[in-house]
């Protein structure tokens, strides 16, 4: 018969060692390459099958999951697939879901807050030119829904949080990578 104390102690030690191992992995979650590029941890995001959302990925496809705060990107016959952490809308009321597509790509986007955004925050400017303080970051993908975009951000604290007025935000280096791969007409789904 197994001694209850040994069983409890063994279970506790096993759990503690797994916890310690996960802490070590978490500490390694953000690394820098030799060129200084930051590598962000995406291991906590669940894999998605493109077939559950799109008919084809030949010209690319983007799925933004607002619950897990990540963006899935697929392209080509070889099933190129990447997951990126995102910022998502502040509230469900600001979140639009469904299918849309990319209608415009802009490097160095300017920004005009909507009337409702300025109502919520009267201190917002009417217009902001491209630049380091622009909340749209370095690149923007305009969607067929008015005023909705997938864009970069210079405020990296927003990534992984509910922090936008409806758009999906990415680290600037991630939006630049996607920007260079997608085409006008690429399908997008927000869930």
Regions found by a protein language model. Name each.
Residues 29-116, 127-132, 139:
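Cell wall/extracellular polymer interaction/catalysis modules
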Residues 1-15:
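N-terminal secretory signal peptides and thylakoid transit peptides that target proteins
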Residues 57, 93, 97-98, 110-191:
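Exported/periplasmic cell-wall-interacting domains
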């Amino acid at each position: 018969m197994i001694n209850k104390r040994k069983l409890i102690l063994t279970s506790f030690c096993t759990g503690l060692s797994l916890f310690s191992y996960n802490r070590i992995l978490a500490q390694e979650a953000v690394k820098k390459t030799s060129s200084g590029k930051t590598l962000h941890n995406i291991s906590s995001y669940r894999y998605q099958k493109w077939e559950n959302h799109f008919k084809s990925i030949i010209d690319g496809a983007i799925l933004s999951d607002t619950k897990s705060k990540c963006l899935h990107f697929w392209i080509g016959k070889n099933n190129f697939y990447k997951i990126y952490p995102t910022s998502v809308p502040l509230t469900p009321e600001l979140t639009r879901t469904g299918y849309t597509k990319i209608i415009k790509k802009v490097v160095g986007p300017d920004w005009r807050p909507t009337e409702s955004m300025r109502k919520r925050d009267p201190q917002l400017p009417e217009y902001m030119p491209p630049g380091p303080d622009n909340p749209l970051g370095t690149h923007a993908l305009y969607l067929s829904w008015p005023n909705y975009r997938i864009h970069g951000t210079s405020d990296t604290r927003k990534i992984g949080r509910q922090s936008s007025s409806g758009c999906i935000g990415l680290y600037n280096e991630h939006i630049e990578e996607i920007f260079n791969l997608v085409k006008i007409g690429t399908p997008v789904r927000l869930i």
